[in-house]
A protein has these predicted regions:
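Short, flexible helical or helix-coil boundary motifs
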Residues: 14, 18, 162, 166-169, ...
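A generic structural signal for solvent-exposed, polar alpha-helical segments
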Residues: 24, 44, 49, 88, ...
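A cross-kingdom marker for long, charged
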Residues: 196-222
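Aromatic- and glycine-enriched beta-alpha-beta binding-site module
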Residues: 60-120
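Mixed-charge (acidic/basic) macromolecular-recognition segments
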Residues: 94-197, 201
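Polar low-complexity intrinsically disordered regions
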Residues: 1, 180, 221-222
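Short Lys/Arg-enriched alpha/beta "domain-start" segment
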Residues: 1-75, 79
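A sequence-level detector of short, solvent-exposed, charge-rich linear segments
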Residues: 29, 170-173, 215, 219-222
């Protein structure tokens, strides 16, 4: 299965639980930066929040990156960020969850799934400014092509558990507070940077990158 198919299945899963309506990504629908072509789509997930996907290809097809972001403003889930990168024979899987809970929720089912799959090769991401709000249920793996099928299966099950968790059933009591918590992460990315953030800031400048992040990728601003 290609990584694009994995992300498509994730979108379909969201759509079954929280019907998706595509929104216009405007000037960001198709962009180029640092030798990469990006295709970006944004959705409103009914009863869930903002969903965005980004597909990037470059370097004569030698690199492919898929990103799926969920800012769950209407359910008390953590902010969800999925990245999958195929490059130079390596397959990297990163799922990051950020604490945007209005009230602490139980997502221990994800930690149990991580533990069941601890044999999959880990990837040390080092230390970052956002570590204090990144949840322990986050995942970072890196392997070769022979690991791709296992990564696919792990991701599908992890995402299923995420959207079927008890937290996914909790309707947010205060959307404003929820959005403020998500904004802490988004504004932190813009201020402190990150791999993708830095690429966009260098290519488009800070104001345009801020617009992409706030209005499209994370939907913290309408």
């Amino acid at each position: 299965m290609s990584i694009g198919n994995v992300m498509q299945q994730m979108l379909e899963k969201v759509n079954r639980e929280f019907p998706l309506t595509e929104k216009s990504a405007g000037e960001f629908a198709a962009i180029k930066a640092k030798g990469m072509k990006f295709v970006i789509k944004q959705y409103e997930a009914k009863g869930l929040g903002n969903v965005s996907v980004m597909e990037a290809k470059g370097f004569f097809g030698l690199m492919q990156m898929d990103t799926l972001i969920i800012n769950p403003l209407e359910r008390d889930l953590p902010l969800f960020s999925y990245d999958r990168v195929l490059a130079m024979g390596n397959d990297t899987l990163i799922i990051e969850l950020y604490d945007t809970f209005v009230e602490k929720q139980d997502i221990s089912v994800l930690e149990l799934w991580k533990e069941e799959n601890k044999n999959l090769p880990d990837h040390d991401l080092g230390e970052h400014w956002y570590d204090s709000i990144k949840l322990t249920e986050s995942v970072s793996k890196k392997g070769k092509k022979e690991h791709s099928s296992a990564f696919d299966k792990f991701t599908a099950a992890y995402f299923e558990k995420f959207l079927n968790s008890d937290a996914a059933k909790v309707v947010v009591s205060d959307v404003k507070v929820k959005n403020e918590k998500a904004s802490v992460y988004v504004e932190g990315l813009l201020s402190n940077g990150g791999p993708s953030t830095d690429v966009f800031k260098k290519e488009f400048g800070e104001p345009k990158t801020a617009k992409l992040f706030r209005k499209v990728l994370f939907g913290t601003e309408k």
